[in-house]
Amino acid sequence: MTLYLDNAATSFPKPEPVCTAVDHAMRHGAANPGRGGYRLSLEAGRTVLAARTAAARLVGMPDPAQIIFVANATEALNLALFGVLRAGDRVVTTSMEHNAVVRPLRALADQGVEVVKVPADRSGFIPPADVKRACTPGTRLLAMTHCSNVTGTLQAVEELGPWCRAQGILCLVDAAQSAGLFPLDVGAMAIDLLAVPGHKAIMGPPGTGFLCVGSGVQLKPLLYGGTGTRSMSDAQPDELPERLESGTLNVVGLAGLHAALEFLQEIGLNRVREHERALLDQLLAGLRRIPAVHLYGPTATERHGGALSFTLAGFDPAVVGYRLDHEFDIGVRVGLHCAPDAHRTIGTFPQGTVRVSPGWFNSHADIDRFLAAVHALAAG
């Protein structure tokens, strides 16, 4: 049986309640929410509201209307970046960002936005003092990851969010690798815009995610169209969430997302974090005992997310990944992980690394199996 260790890309398997909810919605409740007064449409609307309320609870957002449903964190980040920034604006970002931030900012730079990139250290950590120095007067936005998808490094968002607010700078956080694994509170952390995927540590279906929009933040819509409200007007409505949610929502996926959020609430975020941290401790200890392994990122797991990167001396990471799959039936992610700047930062560009990322459904026996496979490869 395949050992899946690529949960930083998407969690697998999904909890059984998620599968059940998706199946039930597809068979019995996949009407168009907010588009009709008949019972099936109203039931679909209740499904969406339940997911929206649970998502708001996860991130400490008092008003569920400020949760905007999207297909993934990439769409959430595009909505935030293109919604806020205009020609002449200045945005500060970092060298640890995913292409979901890098590429929109490149497109915005071509439109006249000034983009300033703060380098991280070799562990992938971005010193807050360096970010503060880069945020000179006139900076419109800080856009940064909460947790690296390459090194697993957790960034000091809890310090930078309040500092940005005091300076009048908007704070956009990519929580792709932290939501569902670390506590998030947009109020306490002073986060104005938070991008969250539903399919990673939250354990929801693919095609789900949301953008949390803080009070007073005005975004230009990314999409325009039908919202089920104010249909007599050809102008996009001003109210949230309708202003930023044009078109039919993924009610089937949102049924699964709601089930995932309830599952996460039931087992407890701390329990998930402690389980994954124990697996990471085991991974780090085991890989350190293999002389040919070079590890990247934090040396301890206190501020370490679910992704762990390494290289094996004498092997291209792509070969390691291929052999783990074909000889040992183990799935990991290799290469640049859609974050080339992060690999430049840690010195692994252009080959990249082998990334292993355990999840809730992995066990210590799984990690033993993985370590034995890496040891066998290293031994030749």
Language-model features: where?
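Pyridoxal 5′-phosphate
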Residues: M1-G380
